[in-house]
Amino acid sequence: MKIIFTEDVRGKGRRGEIKELPDGYANFLIKQNKAKQANAQAMSQLKGQKRAEARKEAEELEEAKKFKELLESGERVVEMKAKAGTDGRLFGSITSKQISQELEKQYGMKIDKRKMELREPIRTMGYVNVPVKLHNEVTAKIRVHISEK
């Protein structure tokens, strides 16, 4: 029997996949609401869902590209002040959470701290480019300037 998986089934198939399975196992999956029979109506519904998902993915990509342009347009620099010693090293460090908060405070742009690809906290003064992963295919750079208090 041909079925369409409505959920991921370990070892058998992923959501949205169409497979030929033995009748007994197919009936079991249908009763568990993990699959449905692959008839013409279900196939057209699946195609519609895939088109909607593709459209949504394209919209998210466009949105990420626009946000990248906003972040990198002009001279957007996130200004931060921290206590520092005489050699230019900070007492403490600047984390992605602090950068995210300052970006929102100064420019009104909200970015999740987990999207910032800061390998380690910033411990020196000066300019630093912080990469931000907005989408699987889109990465922007935020310029951060750390000065002494």
From Swiss-Prot:
GO molecular function: rRNA binding; structural constituent of ribosome
Keyword Transcription regulation recorded: no
UniProt key word Ribonucleoprotein: yes
Superkingdom of the organism of origin: Bacteria
GO biological process, one term: translation
GO cellular component terms, semicolon-separated: ribonucleoprotein complex; ribosome
Annotated function: Binds to the 23S rRNA.
PANTHER family reported in the protein's UniProt record: 50S RIBOSOMAL PROTEIN L9
Protein name per Swiss-Prot or TrEMBL: Large ribosomal subunit protein bL9
